[in-house]
Every structure is written in C-alpha cells, then in structure tokens.
C-alpha cells in the first residue's frame, strides 16, 4: 500500500507513483508531494 498526495510518509510508508517523500515547511514530518513526472 502506498501513500497518496499530502499523506505522511517515511521509510516504511512509501509514496505512490509520481510522488516523492519530502519535508514541507512548516510541517515537521515528511509528506508525499508531486515529483513533477507523469
């Protein structure tokens, strides 16, 4: 199971296709954001 857009992610919870796990200020944990691919 993968994490969708804006979902919390880490080493165990990976993002779905075309998403990348990043820290987005001001959020302190990492979330899945678009990696600009299609």
UniProtKB/Swiss-Prot annotation:
Domain notes: The presence of a 'disulfide through disulfide knot' structurally defines this protein as a knottin.
Superkingdom classification of source: Eukaryota
Subcellular compartments: Secreted
Similarity comment text for this entry: Belongs to the neurotoxin 10 (Hwtx-1) family. 13 (Hntx-13) subfamily.
Organism expressing this protein natively: Heteroscodra maculata
GO cellular component, one term: extracellular region
Molecular-function annotations in GO: ion channel inhibitor activity; potassium channel regulator activity; toxin activity
Cysteines joined through disulfide linkages: 2-16, 9-21, 15-32
Pfam families assigned: Toxin_12 (PF07740)
Function recorded in the entry: Inhibitor of voltage-gated potassium channels. It specifically inhibits Kv2.1/KCNB1 channels.
Family matches, as SUPFAM superfamilies: omega toxin-like (SSF57059)
Name of the molecule in the record: Kappa-theraphotoxin-Hm2a
This protein's UniProt keywords: Amidation, Disulfide bond, Ion channel impairing toxin, Knottin, Neurotoxin, Potassium channel impairing toxin, Secreted, Toxin, Voltage-gated potassium channel impairing toxin
């Amino acid at each position: 199971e993968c994490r969708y857009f804006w979902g919390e992610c880490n080493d165990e919870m990976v993002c779905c296709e075309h998403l990348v796990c990043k820290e987005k200020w001001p959020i302190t944990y990492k979330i899945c954001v678009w990696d600009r691919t299609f």
